[in-house]
């Protein structure tokens, strides 16, 4: 009885708060936008009531408008309630939609629900067939940590014979729709046992900030510890946009802050923790190398969380930073004292979450996939990512897909089929002919390796139609289904080698610097006398690497040129240097030895190859026609841009040196910030030099000598080229056999002629 009373009360409430509908005045015009504080997303002040606009596109990851097709269609989106928000009355869902003008209003409706509670049912009329916005109040009490926003549409265009696949049956939900949260910030619960919360939580929205308070006199070990903390947090925040800030004092911001360093290096620590809190017995008798991690609420502002990573000495600070990777396994409460860190890192080179296994033959279950079933006329495509490093070279022969699938009984074998698409190209389809259905059927498909690259997307689509399908009769489609089994196997015959240097490969998850996920073979080389800007630039690059990896530990090193003593400290590492000849001796040495194209005097005269349209023979045999052109970079570009230049390491031919270069230190951040902006990163094209200016205009220049980098023997490389150029070699073989035939024929003819002459003489 109480449940019935509750439901009646809810409908009365929603009736009193009827949704307001704003319509367009004319077709083709955009929805009128009302500017508000929520649109500009100002930084919250942690006082009073705040608002946040969570858009479908940016916050709910809806990349394109949602289209609901057919007589009946549903779509679900998941959204969260951030743990540090107390949601208030006045929160709203703004849905922007349009639909086919052919729909009958008496039979067509769009219903919107949150957590199975219907907020509104809208009749689909000609008036709202153009882009229309409806505003739905959200009762705060129906929200949970994770919520489901559902759209259900019933749509019809005629009272007579009706085709369920008619193009007139559609309703579209715009990706510009959004949820407007009205909330009051609340104090977080701070406990190292749930790290990285509250410094990051998957339920949060928007760009996440990592705010460091700069040590006043840091050592390279402390800077390395800061980098470790940044790397770890960036890894947690990999699917969100990240902004890294450095403040000289915690009072410069009211956001969560992170303080790294010894108390001597970073005296700001004492504003949040006394000596008694930091070390037992005020540090008396504590052994060198001991680290301490403290997480607590700011005593002066409980809504702010503070993370302190400190130690008796810089080595203890670094140890505390590495301990954050273990998280709740070894950390608890608001303080943890770190004596030793026993890191267990089982990842091998090239092993990375979300990437295909290293072995040539694997099952989809090894990618984390489970048996997946889809139903109905509009069965959703089953998407499978097949990611690999950019130096993977696939052999044309021997790569196969053995698709294992099942489908229901009662399918029309003339119309129902399964289709496999790789990188948006259909490669095979097969009719589902068995009226009784099939279990664990197989489809063996040779994989066209010429379609494959570093980022491969395989899509399997079931096109399902019930037996005796009649568009003029209403037939249920929920009983027809298809399943892809996780035991499906893929064989990809491949080796790993690539032409270097090529800076653009860094856009593929930081290649080659992240082949080891803990980056144990990477050295970051700061200027001799580094400053705050240099440290910020380092953290920007580390943030990108952290977002692109899935490590179990962190092992890269941060050094200055004076620490690069002896070949053993450089030959086994990729080196990444920041600055220019004036402030970084290592860069100056590379420039003096003529390893770099970018110099303090400008940029060398660059001759590049301009790609032209391929001729008939080039299309058959591969390769590109080239014409020499001169690449000119204006002085303005040189002065105002930041550069990434990559060269083969002079210490190890299988390693590289990446120079982050600019005449002006402030310009160094442009290419580093570009790495954190996906739409800019995609503009990185093949080249050993990439320039990015303040407008994020990207220029790629491909000059200098190339070499094959990779662990591959001569015969394997020969096998690859033979397999890749089978057509060319076949034609050359035919030509060679023809020439051999002509030579043999000429010899035989000459021999016959000579014999004939000898016989005539006799």
Stretches with model-predicted labels:
Residues 1-4, 725:
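Positively charged n-region of N-terminal signal peptides that target proteins for export
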Residues 4-12:
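Sec-dependent N-terminal signal peptides
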Residues 15-18:
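Sec/Tat signal peptide C-region and signal peptidase I cleavage site
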Residues 20-762:
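Solvent-exposed alpha-helical segments and adjacent loops
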């Amino acid at each position: 009885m109480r449940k019935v009373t509750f439901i009646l009360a809810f409908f009365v409430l929603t009736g009193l708060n009827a949704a307001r509908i704003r319509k367009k005045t004319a077709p083709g015009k955009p929805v009128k936008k009302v500017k508000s504080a929520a649109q500009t997303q100002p930084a919250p002040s942690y006082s009073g009531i705040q608002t946040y606009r969570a858009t479908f596109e940016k916050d709910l990851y809806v990349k394109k408008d949602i289209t609901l097709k057919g007589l009946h269609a549903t779509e679900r989106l998941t959204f969260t309630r951030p743990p540090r928000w107390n949601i208030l009355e006045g929160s709203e869902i703004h849905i922007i939609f349009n639909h086919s003008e052919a729909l009958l209003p008496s039979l067509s409706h769009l219903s919107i629900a949150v957590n199975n509670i219907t907020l509104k049912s809208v009749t689909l009329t000609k008036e709202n067939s153009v882009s229309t916005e409806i505003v739905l109040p959200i009762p705060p009490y129906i929200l949970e940590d994770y919520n489901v926003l559902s759209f259900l549409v019933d749509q019809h265009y005629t009272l007579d014979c009706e085709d369920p696949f008619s193009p007139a049956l559609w309703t579209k939900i715009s990706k510009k729709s959004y949820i407007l949260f009205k909330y009051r910030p609340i104090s977080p619960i701070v406990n190292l046992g749930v790290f990285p919360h509250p410094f990051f939580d998957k339920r949060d929205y928007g760009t996440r900030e990592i705010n460091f308070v700069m040590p006043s006199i840091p050592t390279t070990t402390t800077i390395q510890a800061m980098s470790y903390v940044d790397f770890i947090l960036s890894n947690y925040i990999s699917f969100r946009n990240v902004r890294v800030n450095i403040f000289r004092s915690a009072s410069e911001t009211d956001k969560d802050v992170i303080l790294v360093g010894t108390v001597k290096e970073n005296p700001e620590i004492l504003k949040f923790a006394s000596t008694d809190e930091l070390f037992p017995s005020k540090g008396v008798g504590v052994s060198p190398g001991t680290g301490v991690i403290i997480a607590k609420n700011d005593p002066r502002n409980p809504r702010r969380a503070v993370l302190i990573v400190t130690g008796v000495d810089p080595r203890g600070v670094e140890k505390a930073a590495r301990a954050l990777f273990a998280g709740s396994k070894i950390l608890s409460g608001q303080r943890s004292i770190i004596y030793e860190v026993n890191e267990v890192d089982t990842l091998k080179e090239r092993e990375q979450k979300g990437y295909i296994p290293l072995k040539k033959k694997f099952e989809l279950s090894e990618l984390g996939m489970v048996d997946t079933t889809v139903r109905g006329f509009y069965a959703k495509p089953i998407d499978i990512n097949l990611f690999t490093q950019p130096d993977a070279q696939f052999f044309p022969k021997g790569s196969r897909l053995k698709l294992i699938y099942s489908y229901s009984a009662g399918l029309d074998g003339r119309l129902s089929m399964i289709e496999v698409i790789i990188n948006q190209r259909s490669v095979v389809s097969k009719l589902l002919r068995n009226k009784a259905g099939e279990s664990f059927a197989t489809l063996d498909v040779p994989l066209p390796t010429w379609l494959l690259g570093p980022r491969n997307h395989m899509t399997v689509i079931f096109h399902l139609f019930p037996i005796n399908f009649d568009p003029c009769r209403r037939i249920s489609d929920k009983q027809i289904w298809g399943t892809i089994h996780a035991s499906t196997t893929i064989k990809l015959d491949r080796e790993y080698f690539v032409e270097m240097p090529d800076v653009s490969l860094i856009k593929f998850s930081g290649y080659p610097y992240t082949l080891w996920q803990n980056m144990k073979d990477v050295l970051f080389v700061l200027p001799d006398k580094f400053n705050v800007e240099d440290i910020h630039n380092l953290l920007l690059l580390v943030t990108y690497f952290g977002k692109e990896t899935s490590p179990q530990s962190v092992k890269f090193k941060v050094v200055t040129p004076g620490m690069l003593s002896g070949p053993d400290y450089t030959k086994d590492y990729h080196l990444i240097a920041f600055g220019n000849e004036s402030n970084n001796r290592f860069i100056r040495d590379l420039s003096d030895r003529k390893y770099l194209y970018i110099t303090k005097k400008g940029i060398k005269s660059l001759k590049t190859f301009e790609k032209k349209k391929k001729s008939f023979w080039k299309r058959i045999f591969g390769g590109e026609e080239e014409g020499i052109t001169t690449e000119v970079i204006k002085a303005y570009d040189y002065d105002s841009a930041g550069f990434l230049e990559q060269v083969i390491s002079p210490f190890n031919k299988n390693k590289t040196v990446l120079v982050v270069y600019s005449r002006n230190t402030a310009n160094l951040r442009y290419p580093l910030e570009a790495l954190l902006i996906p739409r800019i990163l995609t503009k990185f094209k093949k080249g050993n030099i990439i320039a990015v200016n303040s407008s994020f205009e990207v220029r790629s220049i491909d000059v200098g000598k190339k070499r094959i980098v990779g662990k591959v023997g001569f015969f394997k490389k020969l096998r690859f080229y033979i397999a890749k150029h089978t057509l060319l070699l076949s034609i050359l073989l035919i030509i060679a056999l023809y020439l051999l035939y002509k030579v043999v024929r000429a010899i035989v003819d000459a021999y016959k002629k000579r014999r004939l002459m000898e016989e005539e003489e006799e």
